[in-house]
């Protein structure tokens, strides 16, 4: 199956989109639910430690009334994005999608904050982020080294200075030749096009998730707990 056109790569601040249903299959894991594949989507799937977008699909059935349904989950397999819904729909139906902007923007803020924190830890102390999970209200990060309380406070202070500097993020898909000479963080070996998210002077990292345009949009970063 052809890979889904991921609109969130280019348009992370858009909240609505139109698409066409390509396939509808019963969910193998959720009884009474269906996995819907669209030609394009704004819904970011669960991947890279980040929870999926939330929102609705409004499906048009020709002359029949429209059907509005919640998107219960979003997964990606082999580049194809599957939207989990509990209402049957038909192939070739037109879809108008609407994502929950507050939820999306919160994820963008938290994910960009994680990049700043991890980038400063890596460049200053040489430790790598080896685990990351983003939930509704908190981000957890695992590093392959131990930071002292003083070092953690230093990182927190520097991150908040980067936020205050309101730097513009740079996002690109470098060619394989460019990637060979580029230093960037990545937790795994990557295949296919690689999306690079750069915060000038702070971090360069391979990442598939939506981010804020400027660091100032993160607001503030605060360390809540250390284990």
Predicted feature residues:
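A glycine- and charged-residue-rich anion-binding loop/surface
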Residues: 1-227
């Amino acid at each position: 199956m052809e890979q889904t056109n991921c609109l969130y790569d280019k348009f992370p601040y858009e909240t609505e989109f139109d698409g066409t249903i390509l396939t509808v299959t019963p969910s193998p894991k959720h009884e009474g639910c269906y996995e819907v594949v669209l030609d394009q989507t704004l819904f970011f799937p669960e991947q890279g430690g980040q929870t999926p977008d939330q929102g609705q699909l409004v499906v048009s059935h020709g002359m029949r009334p429209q059907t509005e349904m919640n998107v219960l989950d979003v997964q990606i397999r082999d580049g194809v994005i599957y939207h989990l819904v509990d209402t049957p729909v038909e192939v070739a139906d037109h879809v108008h999608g609407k994502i929950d902007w507050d939820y999306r923007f919160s994820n963008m803020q938290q994910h960009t904050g994680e990049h700043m924190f991890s980038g400063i830890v890596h460049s200053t102390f040489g430790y790598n982020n080896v685990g990351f999970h983003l939930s509704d209200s908190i981000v957890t990060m695992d590093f392959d080294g131990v930071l002292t309380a003083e070092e953690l406070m230093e990182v927190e202070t520097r991150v908040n200075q980067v936020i205050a500097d309101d730097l513009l993020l740079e996002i690109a898909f470098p060619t394989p030749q460019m990637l060979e000479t580029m230093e960037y963080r990545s937790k795994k070996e990557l295949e296919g096009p690689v999306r690079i998210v750069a915060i000038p002077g702070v971090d360069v990292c391979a990442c598939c998730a939506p981010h804020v345009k400027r660091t100032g949009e993160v607001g503030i970063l605060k360390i809540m707990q250390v284990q």
